[in-house]
């Protein structure tokens, strides 16, 4: 889903941003579809609870869409980490070494293995590429450990890219946690 035509070839920053934008649009459309299915499902459960076949079909669609949304969300988060690392130029000229030593697909796996943490991912890349530059190491060490909480609490650590990530993740978490409440509100407003 987020791999380029050749899994060793690195995409440009523009290609990463374009792909991320496409995924966000797909995710938003799927969230709307998911919300519509949940509304239909709740209406059907209250108006015709004996229609088990239709309820089961809608539940299956709901499950499938939820899975697709979660996959898109993870893919977007992975691309955001890669985008931040490239755009912030943490590795300076050493980035070429990383591109030569680490295939792009492996980079994506490293991001996932390090829990989508920019700092942990950068440390892993630093080690794998055998970079020995104290300035680069210091840049990595100065990255926040747990960016969602620290960047909200410490304005010195904020930057526009991490803020975007935090904002989007927070909105998705709020949406997911309040989805049942939203569906109930929509149904009550329709009556």
Swiss-Prot record:
It comes from the Archaea. This is Uncharacterized protein MJ0948. It comes from Methanocaldococcus jannaschii (strain ATCC 43067 / DSM 2661 / JAL-1 / JCM 10045 / NBRC 100440).
